[in-house]
């Protein structure tokens, strides 16, 4: 079948969404809040954010495990009891740990969000990383990493980062399953004390929020007076010493990250490119 030129789909210019800027407020407790445009949907999303991540760890996986196991229990409650009450309130949560930032995101109905928030604050503050929970997490994560290391996807990503940044660079370094066995409950408690204190976080709030809810959050945080976040100009310049700020390339409708990588990755010679292409075809066809 032959398509005429006038039947080809039209190319459309990519346009950004017209989203209102978030408000930046400071609660009476001293904590900074980034508040998105409120909307009447009956659900509230709250993100507890710390300006600390894998950049600050001294051992592999300490930051990730310290963040993921914040609700693993304490001297008064087990992990099951902590999560059971969240389920009762109909709340969901997830954790994220990046290079220079970590967060816990909670979602709940507006009528329950304050109870959920107080429960989170109480249990995050009291978290002690029980030995049994830490050991279970280490076994599961080490087994998961072993499975990942049997795939070409893992190794292509790892080799690319190690080649781009260097094996000893914070963005290029990778751990192995055996490194999980070196993480202890003491390591996690120390990292939490240094980096995940409630006084060191800020909040990002979206959904069905209002002034009364923010005042209630502030009251819950009064025992932990907020301090300014130490975000990371020094860390950024150390990570990318050749740049004082991110570069933007004037090409419309493109991914700036991909452009940056394409500009700075050393090109391969023809023979090496052919070998990599052949390897990719073989592995891609096999897996």
Where are these regions (language model features)?
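Charge-rich, well-structured scaffold segments of protease-associated domains
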Residues: 1-7, 26, 37, 81-232, ...
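N- or domain-start disorder-to-order transition segments that initiate the globular core
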Residues: 2-44
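Generic structural motif
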Residues: 11, 22, 33, 91-95, ...
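Residues that act as N-cap/strand-start positions at coil-to-secondary-structure junctions
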Residues: 17-19, 87, 243
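Short, ordered beta-strand-loop transition motifs
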Residues: 17-19, 27-28, 96-100, 251-253
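Broad gene-expression machinery/nucleic-acid interaction feature
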Residues: 22, 43-45, 101-103, 200, ...
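His/Glu-based metal-binding/catalytic segments typifying zinc-dependent metallopeptidases
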Residues: 31-54, 59-60, 228-287
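M16/MPP (pitrilysin/insulinase) zinc-metallopeptidase core fold and M16-derived inactive scaffolds
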Residues: 45-107, 150, 282-286
């Amino acid at each position: 079948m032959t398509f005429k030129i006038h039947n080809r789909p039209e190319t459309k210019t990519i346009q950004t969404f017209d989203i209102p800027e978030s408000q930046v407020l400071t609660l009476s407790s001293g904590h900074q809040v980034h508040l998105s445009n409120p909307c009447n949907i009956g659900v509230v999303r709250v993100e507890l954010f710390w300006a600390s991540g894998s950049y600050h760890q001294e051992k592999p996986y300490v930051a990730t495990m310290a963040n993921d196991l914040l609700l693993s229990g304490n001297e008064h409650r087990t992990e099951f009891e902590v999560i059971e009450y969240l389920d009762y309130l109909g709340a969901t949560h997830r954790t994220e740990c990046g290079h220079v930032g970590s967060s816990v995101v909670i979602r709940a109905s507006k009528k329950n969000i304050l109870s959920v928030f107080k429960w989170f604050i109480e249990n995050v503050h009291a978290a002690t990383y029980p030995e049994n929970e830490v050991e279970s997490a280490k076994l599961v994560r080490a087994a998961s990493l072993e499975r990942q290391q049997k795939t070409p996807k893992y190794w292509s990503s790892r080799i690319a980062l190690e080649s781009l940044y260097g094996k000893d660079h914070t963005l290029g370094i990778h751990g192995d399953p055996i490194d999980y066995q070196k993480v202890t409950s003491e390591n996690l408690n120390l990292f939490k004390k240094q980096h995940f204190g409630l006084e060191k976080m800020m909040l990002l709030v979206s959904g069905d929020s209002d002034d009364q809810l923010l005042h209630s959050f502030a009251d819950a945080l009064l025992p932990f007076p907020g301090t300014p976040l130490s975000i990371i100009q020094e860390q950024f310049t150390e990570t990318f010493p050749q740049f004082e700020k991110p570069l933007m390339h004037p090409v419309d409708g493109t991914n700036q990250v991909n452009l940056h990588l394409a500009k700075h990755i050393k090109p391969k010679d023809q023979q090496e490119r052919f070998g990599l292409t052949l390897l990719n075809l073989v592995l891609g066809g096999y897996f």
